[in-house]
């Protein structure tokens, strides 16, 4: 079980999402990681054999760093919520060796990206790296499926995968990959929901692009699985 703390960094009250929306996001995250998501039946037959229950669960922490009871939801008003990046982590953070910190913001701007194009981000774990690279930063409208949430919550599922060590399946195109033999090679990020896509033919047997994979960029309603090899990396 991964103890979670959610830091809501809001500029205006419209960004200050409810506890209920936060809890809904964690419920959806657990459904995806335990393969209890309602859309498992959408996994194409060619991939059903490698679709995994990751046996990882996320839980809002019961105790804060001082040992006091907590909802594990904090609220901080700050203009840094707009065009946020690692700067919001300096506002509030709980020890990253005990908690997964999730910062919920209005919008995200990373160097090299246009304002508003990034839905969320996280870094793969790297021993010795600074806490600047810890945790997940995510837009409030990608958090949960109620309230201001506008999707099925898969941005959080995807970013938690990075936090637990996963790469994109399209990393390095057809010939490098994500160190998971059961994710077919894919040339570039998948967008939309193209079940006919097969951008790499160097795999044997030649399988279509796994647009169902949470670590690609297909639409939320296309994503529905992690694989056995991805599970092994995360655990």
Predicted region positions:
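Metzincin-family zinc-dependent endopeptidase catalytic domain
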Residues: 27-192, 196-197
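Residue-level detector of secondary-structure boundary/capping sites
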Residues: 16-20, 93, 206, 225
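Stable alpha-helical elements in mature extracytoplasmic
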Residues: 18-25, 152-156, 230-233
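Short, solvent-exposed beta-strand edge segments and adjacent coil->beta transition regions
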Residues: 3, 133-135, 212
